[in-house]
Amino acid sequence: MRQPAVANPVIKESQFEGWVPEQFGQWKTISQSGVVLPPPDTLSDRLYDNLITQVYAAPGLPAVMLLLAYNNAQDGVLQVHRPEVCYPVGGFELSATREMDIQVGSKTIPANFFTATSPNRIEQVAYFTRLGRAYPRSWAEQRIAVMQANLEGDIPDGIMMRVSVLSADAGRAEDQLQDFSRAFITAAPAPLRRVLLGTAT
């Protein structure tokens, strides 16, 4: 059995940023601030090749905060930070995480949803992670995805797409974040869509 090798090249930061649409459908970029970021640590420079934050607005809807975190090589040490780590570090208390799905055409993306609460902010959060061909919903599934790819001879790439809104209404926010995610992925240029979905389409 051959040693696992990196299956995907590094994507230049400027190239990755250029793939992220500033406007699609009714949504338009208004800011890059206000997004809860992964905590800094000794691995920060190695955790992500690309870390993008944007805030999108649409008429009559709460603004959506977007975070994309990508690394071309996810091994047993360097794995995408899950939001359940980032938010408590920022002083938030979290609800239980529940499963949700994001439907993009014929593809169903397994995702997670939770509520993050701080003294001055209630944020509804949805996210998914892709590692190689897998969409792990938990740390355990994430580790299994890395091991399975390694057994196939690959060190997989990994991305997390996280979207959130400031709202006390979890049900309405979940619907909005599903709709936003579907529209964003559909509108993304082919290279970004391939990174998000792990396919050439």
Each language-model region and where it sits:
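Short, well-structured alpha-helical interface segments that form or flank functional binding sites
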Residues: 51, 156, 179
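Sec/Tat-exported extracytoplasmic proteins
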Residues: 24, 28-31, 60, 155, ...
